[in-house]
Amino acid sequence: MSHATDSTLDNASVDSEKVRDFGDDLQNHPVQPTRSILSKIRSRDDDARSLVSNNKGVERIISDLQEGAGQLGPLEQPYDIKKIETHPDPHTDYNEADPWKYPIDSESGLRLVEWVDGDKHNPKNISKAKKWLYTLVLGAVCFVVALGSAIVTGDMERPAEYFGVSEEVIILASVTVFVIGFGVGPLVFAPMSEEVGRKPIYVVTLFIAVVFIVPCGAAKNIATLIVCRLIDGIAFSAPMTLIGGSLADIWEGPERGTAMAIFSAAPFLGPVCGPIFGGLLCDHAPTWRWIYWTFLIVAGVFYAIFIAIVPETHHGILLKKRAKKLRKETGDSRYRSFNELQIRSFGEVAKTSLLRPFVLLSELIVFLMTIYMAICYGLLYMFFFAYPVVYQQGKGWSASLTGVMFIPIGVGVIIATIAAPFFNKDYNRRAQVYRDRGELPPPELRLIPMMIACWFVPVGLFAFAWSSYTWVSWAGPCFSGLAAGFGFCCLYNPANNYIVDSYQHYAASALAAKTFVRSIWGACVPLFTIQMYHRLGDQWATSLMAFISLACCAIPYLFFFFGARVRTFSRYAYTPETNTK
């Protein structure tokens, strides 16, 4: 299940809390065409703080940054520099060492470093071939990470026997702590990437994740497995969190739909393929440790491919590096990127990334969408343990043959991925009516795919429930996964989009809250699934979850008809009149 698609997304946006208490070096100086008004400012990055205090020009830029936040889509909310109007001084001078010839901004007195037309270093200007290469590599990494959460479910008995622990404990050690890590990591890695870029986070966290697969496979006691799987889950959450932002960096909005659909499918296909590969290793590998050794090889190979191919794509970081280089080469301290005007203390970062997500859970839209997505995520992980109960314990099948039964879920995900561009086209058609009138499209337009897809999940669950008798053909519970897989994937992106459009500047925090709660619930479900099936029976255990998912079908309809009214009572929801509160 995607964390990236949240998680995505989940980078902190620019808001009014980011800019305050900046120092007092600058007053309202008139701009001199040949003499720097920033002569007291050294070229060190931490001196950028003194650029903005009491400078009305910079304050206006910051205001534009705030208004431009939230324009890049469901998985990341950076500022859109194209929406920021600068005013070059008509008497500006140019530095010979500056190949881009940045002028002095008449309001701020800065040489504002941004992308120029046709800038070959702009990630959005790279060739289509490279864009698709990066997209496929990023999607493959996301698939491998998601695979790691479920491949261990193919063989639970042998490690439990080796460590001398119960079924519940081995599930806790191999699945639960890993998924908990998925929820914790984004709270740290998303804001960190805004400061240092995406590539360093990818390189370090993936290296840690690959290294800690080794002690999992070599573990001599259950404590080692628990600790190392938790570290792996936290480290592997970084690419799940940041990949959506990387795709937003390279694709323009109208082009991004297909790339995002591929990325969104990868985190679903990974867990679905996990039991397939895990079951084969269970039946044919000499020891359960080969599950980890196989995953180590796959993860290591894709880590190397990723490092070799995908560059840094974060626009703010690339422009910050350019500004720093120009300051050094020209000796002119006025070269500043927009990122350098956004200065936050540690306390502000902590408040934004750690506290605000939980505050936003008090919002009805965030709360109900979080509950809905958490239930769907839990259902996916429920299947990993319900299928062995139905097929291995009920029908006496092998682990590898049971794993094959997950294929229809994957087919449903693929169908949903193919359908995604058509849903997106329908949204753009409906939204254009509002844009032609100079209005923002209402967020509720994002809910139409959810209103269609929500019914597929309970249908698939009821079909699984009442075709899972031992004397009924294997095909019933198997092909019920087709509807469930389609529903899971089709619900996910519209839910993210609706939250983003409803909260704009606070969308990153809202998505982080959803990711955290969803991960905690997804981690807990495997702990009681087997007991639930044994006590309620295969039919009523699945039916219970089907009834819950059926009740959740009311959520998209509720917000489609009443969402606008709900937002009027919100402290944080975005409106064109009030911007962000």
Swiss-Prot record:
Gene, per the UniProt record: NAG4
GO cellular component: plasma membrane
InterPro entries associated with the record: MFS (IPR011701), MFS_dom (IPR020846), MFS_trans_sf (IPR036259)
PROSITE patterns: MFS
One MF annotation (Gene Ontology) recorded for this entry: transmembrane transporter activity
Transmembrane region(s): 132-152, 169-189, 199-219, 230-250, 261-281, 290-310, 365-385, 403-423, 447-467, 471-491, 510-530, 544-564
Organism: Candida albicans (strain SC5314 / ATCC MYA-2876)
GO biological process assignments: hexose transmembrane transport; transmembrane transport
Induction description: Expression is induced in presence of cycloheximide and 4-nitroquinoline-N-oxide. Expression is up-regulated during biofilm formation.
Protein name in UniProt: Major facilitator superfamily multidrug transporter NAG4
Biased composition (Polar residues): 1-14
Glycosylation sites: 11, 125
Keywords assigned by UniProt, alphabetized: Cell membrane, Glycoprotein, Membrane, Transmembrane, Transmembrane helix, Transport, Virulence
Region named Disordered: 1-43
